[in-house]
Amino acid sequence: AQWRAEGRTADAELMESLAAQPTAVWFTTAGAAEVRENVRALVSAAKAKGRVPVLVAYFVPYRDCSQWSAGGARSEQEYKEWIDAFAAGIGDEKAVVVVEPDGLALLTSEPWCAIGPDEELVPQRFREINHAVDTLKRGKHTRVYLDAGHSAWQALDDYDAGYGEPRQQLGIVNRLLRGGVTRADGFALNTSNYRFTEDLVRYGTRISKCLYLRTERGAATCPADEELDALPVRKSKMTHFVLDTSRNGRGHYTPGEGETDWCNPPGRGLGERPTADTGVPLVDAFLWIKRPGESDGECQGGPAAGRWWPEQALELAELASPPLR
């Protein structure tokens, strides 16, 4: 309304088109009673409109290795009580839940993690994620996807020799298995990131095929990418996944000195609109998990993580691929 009043009609129309797209709602703060009531209110409102809400549970202890999005529960017990309340808020209504962005891809054992080398924290993280899966899946109509990073992060089932302590560093397939993915509906890729959809589909399909070989065929490790690519897709047998396409229309950013490729990179655009009609056998949906226009953190001139940044929102809308209007 303000932009229309200022004569910025085209900008205002772009923002209205952006705002019309369904986006996930994140739950990030303490208080079991509060999260139960807030989740219940969201789910009830979505049901009244005939929609299925997408929720993000983001409260795991030592969240984000105490970086821009630091926070989360203070203990394993607090987290379990919080996720129990989260699930109670959904009940048996329809909902999609993305569980703990970076919760498996970013373990506290990463060598640069600010938490420190406490080996007990890694098994604790897996217990927390497993508890979330089992608790949420008690809901009759809750679909649960474990966040699994993105296509340029973790290898499939081997650690990078220069990337941390080998006993704690597992590839993403092992992390998903230890996190309980076989009891969930699948995994999520690219949450709050910028990787091209094509790259994510290739990576996610390889993960699914390796999970199939590990769980159904008794394989000890993932075969080479070429062998995985040659393996036929078995839609009913392989793990499905969802993609965050909210900001990947222009792909990832090549950072300059002192920059990152993930924190408010300039020149990015909105990606594919949210849909369950993806045309990809193993991809259940393209979702807007990250709300376009919410800052990644205090970088590139942006406000604190999660704060609304209208200038970035407008740039994302202007550079959308496919175009927003």
For the regions a protein language model found, what residue spans apply to each?
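N-terminal carbohydrate-binding/catalytic regions of secreted carbohydrate-active enzymes
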Residues: 1-89, 291-323
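Surface-exposed substrate-engagement region within the catalytic domains
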Residues: 2-14, 154-310
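Solvent-exposed, charged interface segments at domain starts and junctions
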Residues: 16-25, 31-33, 141-153, 159-169
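Generic detector of short, locally flexible boundary/turn motifs and exposed helical patches
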Residues: 17-21, 62-64, 108-111, 250-254
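Structural recognition of the beta-strand scaffold that forms the well-ordered cores
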Residues: 24-28, 52-57, 94-100, 105, ...
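Second-shell loop/turn segments in exported
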Residues: 25-32, 67-76, 114-123, 148-154, ...
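Generic low-polarity alpha-helical segments
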Residues: 31-34, 66, 73-75, 112, ...
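Substrate-binding cleft of extracellular glycoside hydrolase catalytic domains
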Residues: 41-144, 158-183
